[in-house]
């Protein structure tokens, strides 16, 4: 890639700045961390690796990066693409081979949703590998739009107010997941991916119900954004400004013992004595 234009330079700086802010705000990376960067071959994970490699050079702390791709043995997966790219970058990398594709095909009847099992198998394999190599953080490439979409998916289809946190300790307690692109917009990531000409591996969408639902939510948000620019950003800010007393979750707020404060001063004016 040659010299960047003014707009291209702004794009690169914006992504680096937003990722840096997210890392700092949530203390995602600390001195001496070994960050396992999970690569799928898509625009998001390539951009995340690029940004983290820059951050590694300029950050006031020292941390290591290890790139990891999981080859799930899906038919047609181009096994040579990522190793060639990572060798050219000159960074440490691992290709974890695990035939989860055959397991899913064997256990899930044709036409049924495979996402849940596929995701669990992939996550479990990556968690185990992170433990094996001594990784202290596991970086995923989810961005702001992914987080907002997940919020609506959970609300519409699961009846819960839940999204993707920028930083998460896994249920096993041994893995901490970070999402450095949490503040970054998908359109910026797409533009940067096009600019850098990353060797994209096409996503083999299975057409499952979960993917179809996510696409519906994505289109809904895009339509909102066209009609009211800035709405997605406002929704994302709302996820950082939660007020449990204004919701209805009894586990988050003690409504049962909520009573008047007898010591509180009256806020009403005695109009009779005016």
Curated annotation (Swiss-Prot):
[4Fe-4S] cluster binds at residues 115, 118, 206. InterPro entries: Rossmann-like_a/b/a_fold, TilS/TtcA_N, tRNA_Cyd_32_2_STrfase, tRNA_thiolation_TtcA_Ctu1. One of its GO terms (molecular function) is 4 iron, 4 sulfur cluster binding. It catalyses: cytidine(32) in tRNA + S-sulfanyl-L-cysteinyl-[cysteine desulfurase] + AH2 + ATP = 2-thiocytidine(32) in tRNA + L-cysteinyl-[cysteine desulfurase] + A + AMP + diphosphate + H(+). It is found in: Cytoplasm. Disulfide bonds: none annotated. Its EC number is 2.8.1.-. Its main location: cytoplasm. Its cofactor is Mg(2+); [4Fe-4S] cluster. One of its GO terms (cellular component) is cytoplasm. The thiolation reaction likely consists of two steps: a first activation step by ATP to form an adenylated intermediate of the target base of tRNA, and a second nucleophilic substitution step of the sulfur (S) atom supplied by the hydrosulfide attached to the Fe-S cluster. This is tRNA-cytidine(32) 2-sulfurtransferase. It comes from Pseudomonas syringae pv. syringae (strain B728a).
